[in-house]
Amino acid sequence: MRWRAAIEEVARDYDRVLHLGDSMGASAALLFADVADASLAFCPQVDLLTASIRPGRSGAWMRRHRDATLDAIERAVVTRGCAIEIHSGTWEHDLAQAELVPAAMEARGVGCVGGADGAAGSVKVVAHHVDNHRLALALEEANELLPIVRKALHEQLAEAAKAREG
């Protein structure tokens, strides 16, 4: 996949990589989680066949996208020790997409669900009391988005510093 190669090439230049995205950007943060040390995804669309918000693509393409995303998450957690944090509102469609990830990992026998905040090799779902797909905007308006992003960045900076001292 040409995007994966491009992302891998850029990521090689950094001690730590954090992928961050909202909606389909969150989907990309998960799709390429295996070339990151952490992924922070707000309302990702994982299974486009069941998502209420989806592109005009074939069912076969959507199944390949779902499988590629879940495969990347598994590689990220098992091989890289990536910390994946998925944020969702309470809107049932977004929550179903978010909860699909830990359920799929459990079904695959990948023991990574829950864990401490920012724990390596983990998938964590955080639900917020926002009942629509515009979660990142709602968090920003409530002054809650920046602390979430700042925490994720600080964790990666601390890991990079620890590795340099190591």
Could you say what each language-model-derived stretch is?
Residues G21-G25, A29:
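Gly/Ala-rich beta-loop-alpha elbow adjacent to hydrolase catalytic centers
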Residues A28-F32, L100-V101:
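A short acidic, amphipathic alpha-helical/loop segment
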Residues M1-R12:
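Alpha/beta-hydrolase active-site loop
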Residues S52-A138, A142-R164:
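The feature captures the conserved acid-bearing segment of alpha/beta-hydrolase catalytic domains
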Residues V17-H19:
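Conserved alpha/beta-hydrolase fold motif
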Residues L31-L40:
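Conserved hydrolase catalytic core segment
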